[in-house]
Amino acid sequence: MPPEEWGPPIWTLFHCLAEKMKEESFPVVIKPLFGHIYKIASFLPCPECSQHAKSFLAKINPTRIKNKTDFKNILYVFHNAVNKRKNKALFNSEHLERFYAQRNLVNVFNRFIYVYNTNGNMKLLTESFHRKFVVSSFKKWMIENAKHFS
């Protein structure tokens, strides 16, 4: 599956989580959520994409993210860094907020699971196994923490 197919659902998940996180839940949610995002990025269906994502995310200390707005801005910068590298149009942050605020998080999450669990080629079989583990762990966390999202 090419990045054009699995990339948008993953970005949609990341941005929706940031947009729909309750402000008062931020201190409780940010560190584990950032950890899950890092794990998801570590096992993307494209090894080169995973390396770029891990390199970007490794520079971020989640304890220094002070609020929901900071988190949304980090994801915005991350997404635009990827778009710039791929010679794609850059996003306007206001567009992102409006777009992702309208999404249903359950539907977004289910779409993410569908594309993220895709089986790659045989060379990526180990990564496919890891993706299934990442999804299982993240799904459990999301169920336990659904109250922190609108």
Task: Give the residues covered by each predicted segment.
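Aromatic-rich, lipid-facing transmembrane alpha helices and their immediate juxtamembrane interface loops
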Residues: 1-150
